Each structure stands twice: as C-alpha cells, then as structure tokens.
C-alpha cells in the first residue's frame, strides 16, 4: 500500500517545546520569551497541501485562516512559531540553488507513483498560487504570526532524507544537486532509512551548498526573530563512527551561519537568534558530529532544543543534558515529535500531556 506524502512527512512536526531552564535569556527579542517559550515547529506540508481547508491548492487567505488557530488569539499558549523551510528535498521557497516543492519542470520530470504525483503537483500549484499573490508559505505564515505578537523563526532541516531513494523512480522529487552528485552521498546504509543516499558533510561542496541555502533564506526573510538549524531531520551527517573526528566541519558551518546572522542583525537593527535542534545527550550529539558545547563556548547559539526523531519520548534526559552541557545561561528545550504510528494516528491530548 502506498503511503501518502502526508503520512511520510508527518504533516506537522510539533515541537511542543516546554521550557526546561528558566535561566536568563537576555538575548531574546521578546519579553515573554525571556521567561519561557512554547514553540510550535511546523513542517509546512499541512499548509501547502491545504489539509485544513479541503486539500485544494492553497491561497494566501487559507494561510491567514490557518494561522489564526496557531496563535494566542486561537487560544493557544504558543509563544514562538517556527516554519520549516524544508531541505534539499521538499524545498518550500523559490531558490536559485534548487527547485521548489512540486516543481516538476512543467511535467517533464517523471513520477513512478501516481499518489506522489498528485500530491507533488498539488504542492507545486500551491507554491505558484502564493507566488502570484506576492508571497510564499514562509512569508505568509511568519508575517501573520508577527501580527499576533509571536516570536518567529525559520527551521531548516540540515539533511532531510524524505525521497532520498533513487530506486523509487520519482525523479520529480529528487533535488538536482543531490541527484547529479552521488559521489557526495555517505553510501553507508547502517544508519537507517535512506542513510546510504544521505549527503556526506565531509565534502566541502555539500557544506557550501547547505550554507548557500541558509544564507539565501536569512537574507530573504527580514521578519524573522531567529533561525534554527534542525540537525534531527535527519541525524545523518557522516559515515558511522566519523562524527567526533569531523565535528569541527559542522562547527565551522555553525560559525559561518552565526557570522551571517550577526551581519544581518546589524543591518536590521535587532538581534537575530540562532537555535539548534540536536540529540538528547551531549555525548550522542558529538558522536554524530555536533559539538554543542563548543558552539556554546564560542557564543554561537542562543538556545538548544533536544529530542528524538519521529517519536514521543517520555524520558528525555533533560537534567543530564543540562549538566553535561554546562551552559546554564543558554535555555534548553525538550521536544515532542508528532510521529510514531503507521497507518497515521495522531497522539491524543492525554498522550501529549503525558509526554510533557
């Protein structure tokens, strides 16, 4: 049985992020977020596929209506709204570095799966509708969030592996840079789903490609209060066992991103925050190439979110992470992911409360 795109993506990544540390957060751009944050991290597919309003190609009015439910006016306690920008796969904004979600070059790129074709073309028409109205899903969502007094972030998936499978035959879903450069893949299948065709960040070309996408977004969206590097989608950066040795390569990427952010902060006259999403232990993070302590030592990051991939974990070791991290001045948040069941079954309110 084919899984729909919505099932594969999980619709919304709900980082129902509960404050773990109430230590000072003077770098925050909003008074409320100095005390705590409740973050909604949305993966964007429910908006672009218009799951809220009948599944027809989306228009800006749909995004405006959709956003009401996400805001304090919609009776939520969410302080911070993050909109995912995608990754190489399922990239939402129009970009000079790749095709946007649903761009099959006017139907010239093949699909092997009719269900994927239908959803991909729906997403593409939604992108074009929004473009014709002078906006896109990121701009429309975050501007609306700002209108309601929310802190706004873009969340970028550092190495998303949805559709990273050439055997599927769905060429329309393959990013050109990824498809044309298999020499930049890990070719290591030991790390789970599609990991063998994941980008290997050992290659400077891969790192530069990612930095180009990040810088493009930072320059394009001037309404943001911050930017998140989501290393958990997916947590494959190097071949198995190479993370600790090659962690300085990722640190340099974080450093360059911070430099771009600081330059833009000076131009725009307000501080733009840099956040990261990483595994639930400091040791586990560096095993994957993520030296979170070094980033904090250098003053590169403003807050950290920890979590697992695609699971609702009731036992995230927040206190141990805080102890091992050693930076009490930097807030640490725990996340609740929206995934876990196939066929698709959402967690109940009680389950969310239990995980929290």
Regions found by a protein language model. Give the residues of each.
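Hydrophobic faces of well-ordered beta-strands that scaffold small-molecule active sites
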Residues: 38-42, 79-83, 152-154, 227-229, ...
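Catalytic domains of carbohydrate-active enzymes, especially glycoside hydrolases
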Residues: 62-90, 220-226, 300-304
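Bacterial Sec-dependent signal peptides at the C-terminal "C-region" and cleavage site
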Residues: 13-32
């Amino acid at each position: 049985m084919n899984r729909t795109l919505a099932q594969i993506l999980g619709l919304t990544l709900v980082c129902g992020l509960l404050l773990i540390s109430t230590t000072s957060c003077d770098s925050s751009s909003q008074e409320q977020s100095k005390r705590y944050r409740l973050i909604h991290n949305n993966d964007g597919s429910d908006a672009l596929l218009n799951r809220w309003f009948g599944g027809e190609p989306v228009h800006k009015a749909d995004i405006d209506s959709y956003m009401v439910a996400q805001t304090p006016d919609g009776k939520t306690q969410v302080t911070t709204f993050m909109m995912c920008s995608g990754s190489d796969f399922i990239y939402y904004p129009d970009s000079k570095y790749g095709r946007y979600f649903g761009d099959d070059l006017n139907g010239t790129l093949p699909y092997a799966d009719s269900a994927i074709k239908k959803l991909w073309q729906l997403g593409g028409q939604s992108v074009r509708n929004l473009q014709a109205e002078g906006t896109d899903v990121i701009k429309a969502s975050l501007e609306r969030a700002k209108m309601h007094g929310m802190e706004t972030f873009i969340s970028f998936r550092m190495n998303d592996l949805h559709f990273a499978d050439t055997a599927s035959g769905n060429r329309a879903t393959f990013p050109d840079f990824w498809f044309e450069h298999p020499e930049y893949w890990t070719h290591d299948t030991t790390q789970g789903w599609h990991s063998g065709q994941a980008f290997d960040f050992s290659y400077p070309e891969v790192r530069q490609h990612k930095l180009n996408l990040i810088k493009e977004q930072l320059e394009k969206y001037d309404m943001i209060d911050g930017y998140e590097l989501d290393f958990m989608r997916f947590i494959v950066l190097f071949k198995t066992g190479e993370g600790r040795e090659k962690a300085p390569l990722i640190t340099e990427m974080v450093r360059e991103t911070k430099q771009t952010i600081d330059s833009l902060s000076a131009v725009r006259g307000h501080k733009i925050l840099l956040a990261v999403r990483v595994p639930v232990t400091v040791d586990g993070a560096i095993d994957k190439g993520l030296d979170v302590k070094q980033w904090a030592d250098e003053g590169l990051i403003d807050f950290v979110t920890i979590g697992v991939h695609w699971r609702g974990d009731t036992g995230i070791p927040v206190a141990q992470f805080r102890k091992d991290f050693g930076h009490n001045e930097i807030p640490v948040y725990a996340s609740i992911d929206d995934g876990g069941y196939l066929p698709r079954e959402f967690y109940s309110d009680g389950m969310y409360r239990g995980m929290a």
